[in-house]
Amino acid sequence: MVLPASMRLRGHRCFSRLHRSQRRHHGKWMVLRQIKRDRTLLRSELRSQHDTTCRCALVISNKVSKRAVRRNRLRRLLHNHLRQRLEQRTDLAGTWLLFSLRPDAAEAEPAQLLEECDSLLKIAGLER
């Protein structure tokens, strides 16, 4: 399943700010970047909405896999996992997260990716 619209992070300004973020947590297959929200970076129609949970984005480049089918499968797997973990967490409202998969992530087993995702959330202080 895809992340609900209330949890999605969109817009090049948001991604640029997250890429410059100092709060990075590195794993073997992915990198987690984290910042507090900055409403000025959002599109005008989203600025007035109140965040009920954190906003997330997932970046999977062509370096991970040349095949779109494989990249989409990884995206769906991680979106579903993040949705289950973070959708009900109202204490994380105002936090923006960016998960970037590394090129060798395509060789990892799905269980390993989900475990690393959880460990990065725990390191970042976002997991209970």
UniProtKB/Swiss-Prot annotation:
One of its GO terms (cellular component) is ribonuclease P complex. Its EC number is 3.1.26.5. GO terms for molecular function: 3'-tRNA processing endoribonuclease activity; ribonuclease P activity; tRNA binding. Gene3D superfamilies: 3.30.230.10. The keyword RNA-binding applies. The keyword Lyase does not apply. Keywords: Endonuclease, Hydrolase, Nuclease, RNA-binding, tRNA processing. It is an enzyme of class 3 (hydrolase). It catalyses: Endonucleolytic cleavage of RNA, removing 5'-extranucleotides from tRNA precursor. One of its GO terms (biological process) is tRNA 5'-leader removal. RNaseP catalyzes the removal of the 5'-leader sequence from pre-tRNA to produce the mature 5'-terminus. It can also cleave other RNA substrates such as 4.5S RNA. The protein component plays an auxiliary but essential role in vivo by binding to the 5'-leader sequence and broadening the substrate specificity of the ribozyme. Belongs to the RnpA family. Consists of a catalytic RNA component (M1 or rnpB) and a protein subunit. This is Ribonuclease P protein component. It comes from Synechococcus sp. (strain CC9902).
